Amino acid sequence: MTGIKIATIGGGSSYTPELIEGFIKRYDELPVREIWLVDIEAGKEKLEIVGNLAKRMVKKSGLPIEVHLTLDRREALKDADFVTTQLRVGLLEARAKDEAIPLKYDVIGQETNGPGGLFKALRTIPVILDICKDMEELCPNAWLINFANPAGMVTEAVLRYTNIQRVVGLCNVPIGIRMGLARLLEVDASRVHVDFAGLNHMVYGLDVYLDGVSVMDRVLELVTDPEKQITMENIAALNWEPDFIRGLRAIPCPYHRYYYKTREMLEEEKEASVEKGTRAEVVKQLENDLFELYKDPNLDIKPPQLEKRGGAYYSDAACSLITSIYNNKGDIQPVNTRNNGTIASLPHDSAVEVNCIITKEGPKPIAVGDLPVPVRGLVQQIKSFERTTIEAAVTGDYHKALLAMTINPLLPSDKVAKQILDEMLEAHKEYLPQFFKKVEK
């Protein structure tokens, strides 16, 4: 590879400036020649705004990178070396429904967990598989770097249902946890290593090392301190019960609050929706503010306000991964990849989120073995939910969708699961043609 071509699907995303910043910072290691930002007709205006900011950022850098804006996905994919996906099918309006409808039934309404995660997968997976068909024809040797949520399910769907096996799923949660732990330990993050294992948005830190020495006991005490909670912009920092964390002997990710503190998180969500609206509505206002900033012809850097969007560290994760693949670095990064026995208690062809050695051949997972008993059951239950959801997304099988909804631990009963499923299917009908091509219930 000389002079890299990158195609970013969902290029009109508010996250794009962070990605551009990452490529500029790493140019010496990652000589990007072309960046193609792709979007759909509905995202045309945002693509223009964010694309022009990207061009100004590149111009300021003085680097010989060409930024192209297009609505023609196939043009962008032709001969690409890396394809990044950061799309949102149905935009924030769909997310708002994912969050609001379950709340009516006293069920968590969240973007990637419970009913919301199920429906985001149902909408997103067919679109990603369609992109992969184009990749098989136009850039069969490209790497697909996916950060479209739910990243784990999307990655697994690609692995199981397409010929694109050079796929890696990315999330900013593990890097956010490592940075958070470094802050608690008051050290530079480069000195901190976390043994990550689990699934996307269901990942645990099984051990924490400082300069190669385990500091797990110290960290377990730090993360139970009410003043030192690790969370994200989009998740309430409800305090963990100290004795629970000591018993778990693992660092939960912020999303685990939905499973271990379901009642409290539900109450918090309901209160927040009354005061501020759903998270989607909050994000929509943040995005409107960001795009107003992006329009400024004098702006030629990523604005710091982007971190409020909840996307901190995405650029670091994505650009570090691409740089390591390109340079065959052999460093360790947590990513979503094929299990292949890495976690003994999960199917081999499933996607898991684990530490991997990153090479030019892609991620080489570091063996985990069996997950500890206290975390194993929940991870297995979520994996059953994920696999059933993927099958529903691919086939449009109503019964599989209902089964997935019902076995998710955030649902109280099969009856409520069916009520939510039916209402959400109708609400998202235009993005779920696979369920409406035939009448069957």
Where are these regions (language model features)?
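Glycine-rich phosphate-binding loop and adjoining beta1-alpha1-beta2 segment
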Residues: 25-62
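Conserved NAD(P)H cofactor-binding loop of Rossmann-fold oxidoreductase domains
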Residues: 87-90
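Rossmann-fold NAD(P)-binding glycine/threonine-rich loop
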Residues: 93-161
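Short acidic low-complexity segments
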Residues: 66-79
